[in-house]
UniProtKB/Swiss-Prot annotation:
The keyword Cell division does not apply. Disulfide bonds: none annotated. This is Aspartyl/glutamyl-tRNA(Asn/Gln) amidotransferase subunit C. It catalyses: L-glutamyl-tRNA(Gln) + L-glutamine + ATP + H2O = L-glutaminyl-tRNA(Gln) + L-glutamate + ADP + phosphate + H(+); L-aspartyl-tRNA(Asn) + L-glutamine + ATP + H2O = L-asparaginyl-tRNA(Asn) + L-glutamate + ADP + phosphate + 2 H(+). It comes from Mycolicibacterium vanbaalenii (strain DSM 7251 / JCM 13017 / BCRC 16820 / KCTC 9966 / NRRL B-24157 / PYR-1) (Mycobacterium vanbaalenii). GO terms for molecular function: asparaginyl-tRNA synthase (glutamine-hydrolyzing) activity; ATP binding; glutaminyl-tRNA synthase (glutamine-hydrolyzing) activity. InterPro entries: Asp/Glu-ADT_sf_sub_c, GatC. Heterotrimer of A, B and C subunits.
């Protein structure tokens, strides 16, 4: 029995702002159903006595050295920008005035 319907995939696509065709909805419904089936199998595994871990690796907060290196000039960085304003990238407003 299917665990996820085509309508549920369409709803998820709307939430993610994805425009999916009918064939994509059908395809993704099948793929997500298979994934949920695998998750169901994993949930049946007996993990009694297995210590919970958040990260199996012992490396914590590994950073690269903070070394100054050559980079682009402001002009080079803005050269391919479609729109600039006073030496900055200009992008469309996404939030209203009150926000």
């Amino acid at each position: 029995m299917s665990q996820i319907s085509r309508d549920e995939v369409a709803h998820l696509a709307r939430l993610a702002r994805l425009a999916l065709t009918d064939s994509e909805l059908d395809s993704f419904a099948g793929q997500l159903d298979a994934i949920l089936g695998h998750v169901g199998q994993i949930q049946t595994v007996d993990v009694t006595g297995v210590e919970a871990t958040g990260n199996p690796l012992k490396d914590v907060n590994v950073f690269r050295p903070d070394v100054e290196a050559p980079s682009l000039t402001q002009e080079q960085a803005l050269a391919a920008a479609p729109n600039t304003d006073e030496g900055r990238f200009a992008v469309p407003r996404i939030l209203g005035e009150a926000e």
